Amino acid sequence: MIISPQSLDTNLSQLLAEVKSGSMQLPEFQRDWTWDDSRLRGIIASLSQGYPMGAIMRLQYGNPDIQFKYRTITGVKGVSVKPEHLILDGQQRLTSIYQATSSKEPVSTKTEKGKAIKRYYYLSMEKCLDDDEDRFDAVLSIPEDRKIKENFDRDVKLDLSTREYEYENKL
C-alpha cells in the first residue's frame, strides 16, 4: 500500500503543544539542535511579523514494520511517552521556537563565534510598534540573570529579573 503525503495547515501553538506533551518527537538519527543566538532572534522576528515558519515534515509513528528510536527535542523535560509523530524536517525551527517561547529555562545556545551562552528572549513592544524599526532589533537576547550590564558588569543598564520590571520596560 502506498501512502501519499498530506499537506496540513497546523497552527504554531498546536505544534508547540505536541512538542511539549511528547506526541511529536525526533527520530534518534536526527542531528542535535545547533542554532545560534542570531538565528533565534531572526525566527522570532519573522514570526512576530506574521511570516510563515516554513514546512515541517513529520512521519506518523506506529507502523510495526518501521520502528525508530526516538527522543524529545532539546528543552522538553519530564516526557516519557511514545510519540504520535516524528519530526523529519523542521527540527531546528521548532526547537528554537519552543525553547524561546514555551520553556521556563533560558535557551542554551551560542554566539555567532561559537561561545556558549544562555539567553531569554523578549520583544520590545515600543520597537515592534515603530514602523521605522527593524523587527530583528526589537528581539532582545537577555543573559540568564535577566540583566544587561555595562561598565565591565558593574552597572545594570536593564533589569528584567521580575515580572514587574518586564512590564515596566514594556517587554
Language model features with spans:
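Basic- and aromatic-enriched surface patches that contact anionic nucleotides/nucleic acids
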Residues: 2-37, 41-171
